[in-house]
A protein has these predicted regions:
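Acidic, low-complexity, intrinsically disordered peripheral segments
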Residues: 2-7, 23-29, 35, 407-434
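Periplasmic alpha-helical coiled-coil/stalk elements that build and connect Gram-negative outer-membrane
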Residues: 7, 129-251, 351-354, 358, ...
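Bacterial N-terminal signal peptides
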Residues: 9-18
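Bacterial Sec-pathway N-terminal export signals of envelope proteins
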Residues: 22-81, 85-86, 105, 119, ...
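Amphipathic alpha-helical coiled-coil segments
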Residues: 47, 59-74, 132, 136-157, ...
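Small/polar (Gly/Ser/Thr/Ala-rich) solvent-exposed segments
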Residues: 58, 77-95, 105-131, 151, ...
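Residues on the lipid-exposed face of transmembrane beta-strands in outer-membrane beta-barrel proteins
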Residues: 99-103, 215, 308-312
Length: 434
């Protein structure tokens, strides 16, 4: 009966442990939604899938769980000791046997310092996971917007190819009487421009495949899966205040938070090292039984002894070395945090400038350069059809508007990529902070 109860209890413990692991997984409704690869369209589709499927992020998550379990173990006492003794050769007078149970208690404050160290390390592991999650999100968004830019650029070039082919037809129509097998200068210029754009389009298509490969690697998807062209969301970029960004960064950046917890863990380790000079206390009970040979159990005598023991911390040189090493580690981590903060602030300053500058360039292309280039192209195209402009001028105007449109898409992608990096550095979304 007792064996059956133990088996049932074991099954229940296993089930509860599995439930606990399942509950411990990152919990986000958007993340947990399984998205079919051919349905990836928005950044939310990509980042949500990556956060639940990326192998590297899962590995760091398990490191966090391991550190959490170690923190729980650090609060426990050492295992009690059990000893049993009897005489190898029984005497003719008495038969003697004894049982000893001992529990060691670390010196006052040792367990607390050890537990604080483990808890701070677990918090640091949590922040490391959060930093890895934000880095993955930034990388996915960077590749997403690059993929979107390349898709738009390919479409723009295809539209320009159609326009150039129209110019070629116009050039042929304007000079129909030519020797067989010869081309007019206008058609030569037009076809040269077409060939150049076709080569440019092929290069962008290859680059698009490379970018899609990076996305599939981040999402842990097979290489043979085809990702659809991503869709841009309409957005109105707003200037980010650098002082606000710095405040958010110092409060929420997970890398800095993780290093802060590591500093606290190192200081707790110093406290623990300082207590190595103090002994640990052991309390035990010894039960001894004696009886004459042939006597029954009721005629035996039992003695109980309370035991007190102490460890002897004699090797003080090793304790001093341990303390110095703990102090050195704490100082090193403090300096590491200072260097990390300075580096992150410098990076944030540069990216914030690029982000705000891109907003100005977005307005310049959208409101001034592209509309004026389109107006100029219409005027030159009309003049060319009427014979009042040459093909070189027309091709130049067409190339100018294509370059403006490509630059506009480039600056849109740069703006979104810079925002993704700023959000990673700040440790939070910045659209809600505007």
């Amino acid at each position: 009966m007792r064996t059956t109860i133990f088996k049932i209890s074991g099954v229940i413990i296993v089930i509860l442990a599995q439930c606990a692991v399942a509950i411990g997984e990152p919990n986000n409704t958007a993340m947990l939604a399984i998205v079919e690869p051919n349905r990836f369209l928005t950044t939310e589709d990509y980042t949500g899938y990556a956060e639940t499927h990326n192998a590297g992020l899962k590995n760091i998550y398990q490191q966090w769980i391991t550190a959490t379990e170690e923190a729980a173990q650090a609060k426990s006492l050492p295992e009690p000791q059990f000893a049993y003794g009897t005489y190898a050769q029984e005497t003719e007078v008495y038969e003697r046997q004894m049982v000893i149970v001992t529990q060691m208690f670390p010196w006052f404050g040792k367990i607390r310092a050890r537990a604080e160290t483990a808890v701070r390390n677990a918090e640091a592991a949590k922040q490391k996971y959060e930093a890895a999650r934000l880095l993955l999100t930034k990388e996915v968004k960077r590749d997403f917007y690059e993929y979107a830019y390349l898709s738009e650029a390919i479409n723009i070039i295809k539209e320009n190819l159609e326009a150039l082919r129209g110019f070629e037809e116009t050039a042929v129509a304007r000079q129909p009487v030519v020797a067989k097998g010869t081309e007019t200068p206008d058609t030569v210029y037009a076809r040269a421009a077409i060939t150049k754009l076709e080569d440019m389009s092929k290069g962008l298509e290859l680059l698009s495949e490379v970018t899609a490969g990076r996305l599939k690697a981040s999402l842990n998807l097979p290489a043979e899966i085809n990702l659809p062209a991503p869709q841009w969301k309409d957005f109105v970029p707003e200037i980010i205040d650098y002082d606000l960004l710095v405040n958010l960064l110092r409060q929420k950046n997970p890398e800095l938070a993780g290093l802060s917890f590591e500093v606290m863990a190192a200081k707790s380790k110093v406290k623990n090292a300082e207590k190595s000079f103090y002994p640990d206390i052991g309390i035990g009970v010894q039960l001894e039984q004696m009886k004459r040979p042939g006597a029954n159990t009721q005629e035996s005598s039992r003695d109980t002894m309370i035991m007190l023991s102490l460890t002897l911390p004699l090797w003080r040189d090793s304790y001093i070395s341990e303390q110095r090493r703990a102090v050195s580690d704490a100082t090193n981590i403090e300096q590491q945090r200072i260097r990390a903060e300075n580096s992150i602030l410098a990076k944030a300053s540069q990216v914030c400038y690029e982000y705000n500058d891109s907003i100005k360039r977005i307005g310049l292309y959208r409101e001034t350069l592209i509309p004026k280039a389109e107006e100029s192209l219409r005027s030159v195209e009309k003049a060319y059809k009427e014979g009042n402009a040459d093909i070189i001028t027309l091709l130049g105007e067409q190339r100018a508007i294509m370059d403006y449109r490509l630059s506009y898409q480039r600056v849109l992608a740069d703006n979104r990529q810079n925002l993704a990096e700023l959000e990673m550095l700040a440790g939070t979304g910045l659209n809600k902070q505007q």
